[in-house]
Amino acid sequence: MSSDTIIGIDLGTTFSAVSVVKGRRPVILPNKQERIMPSVVGLSPKGEWLVGTPALNQWALAPESTVRSIKRDMGTDRTVALGKHTFTPQDISAFILRELKRVAETHLGHEVQRAVITVPAYFTDAARQATKDAGQIAGLEVMRIINEPTAAALAYGLDREEDQVVLVYDLGGGTFDVSLVELVSGVVEVRASHGNTRLGGDDFDDLLAEHLRQAFEKQHGVDLRHDRKAMARLNRAAEKVKIELSTHPFAWAREEYLAEKGGKPLHLEVEVNRREFEGLIGDLLDSTRTSIQQALTDARMTTKDLDKVLLVGGSTYIPAVWELVTDATGLDPRQEVHPSEAVALGAGVQAAIIAGQPIDAILVDVTPHSLGIEVAEMTWRGWVDDRYSVLIHRNSTIPVTRENVYATLYPEQDTIELKVYQGEQTIASKNTLLGEFKFTGLKPEREGELAKVTVQFSLDVNGILQVKTHDRGSGRETGITATAMKERLSQEQISQAQKRLAEASPTLALDAAGEALVGRARKVLEGAELKPESAQDLVEALAMIDKARRLGDEPEMQTWLEELADLLYELED
């Protein structure tokens, strides 16, 4: 496997993973013993940057210095503060992507520069472009953005000879998608998608944490809502209970010294049974049933057309999810590909296809949203504005190009303001505004007539929109990427973000053996009569370990840990 390798990345809300294809099969590249990595970034009290498990471990203790679930803010103008630093969602995602890049490079033994990254099928155009920007900040050329349920179907369908229609139900930590996919002779064709980019395990945790908070207040008379650290610990307890309830009928939520009253410590100890939990999340789960039906309707299918139902995402371990999907489809769900790894594995397959590896699969995807512009329509009452004219309808196969001709409202009009929207509402302003720009200097084809403009939408394989306009009178054209008009980072901003990321190197965590080794060395330095040269060797080894950790250089860190072990063996013998 050469430096031309393209890696596949599942950039998840709560967990992320990286994969490649080896021997015609996709494999997860683990980070030490972890096959999936928490999508968490933090700044330690010592000013060290933490990514993954080390950041997650500090979250309950220092929520103000830790960022989780940043994926939900991709494509927005929200910023987050860590210490003295202010970051965009793209910046935080770049921390995670850089760590996954490092994991891949450690396994492959060479630099990695290209990637395929997955996103929810229902991600907006702006969120998709933000994901590409995050990859660029992390030093990755993003070769393709593909939808998560599509990636899972690609992993599932690899080398399967039988033709089948598969419903992919993808419920992760922060987003939900359902897709209808046809697998025919190595072609993976998406027929329809539907979903919700703000529905997942995080929401279940929040509901259960609120249930625990109310139980704690009822028992102790203390309201924890304004105690950020206590609420983070409640959320952590809720997540543990949720996971345990997937395999047990009841579970205990326990957190010692959660608060104090009158100088006395107060502990959380609440039992939750599975029926209670299912009651809390019932309405959210029911909303996914609507998405299943909508996807079937859009694909012009019924449940009788389905051959398989594939469950993807960590939240599909919840028994109530299985029951709902079985009831909604009439089929027993399958988990033939690991639910938490399926998306990353599919990304690895798509990456291998782009890299030219001999993979017998072709991916055909769709756009989940309609795309159009605001227009005015003539009615019996006169002109009515804020109407929505759709150029590309939802569930159109991508890539796709569509165009339409629009006229000005009156002969002398030489300027139009083009507002580009994404959504399904007939009132334009009720949809998501992707951007707007002015087109001036319009000329009619013949004097006294209305000027006419051809508007062309081109949606590429990444689901990113290009808009072109053509003045039929003057022949002048203009073109722009829709997201360049709204929330997209400029090239200068990306360069600045790359510089910030380079300066904010994550500190590698030591495992238990490494911590013990460093601790032994420090005790030897403090308590033993050492020759100056021996003490100097120990000090140098500790300094080099610390430097490698700060630089995120794991091979160098391991080399110096081995050197330290040899030194201690000689000194302690």
Feature map (PLM): residue ranges:
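Oxyanion-binding/catalytic loops of NTP- or PPi-dependent enzymes
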Residues: M1-T76, V80-T86, F95, A104-D573
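Conserved cytochrome P450 K-helix/beta-meander segment immediately N-terminal to the heme-binding cysteine loop
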Residues: R98
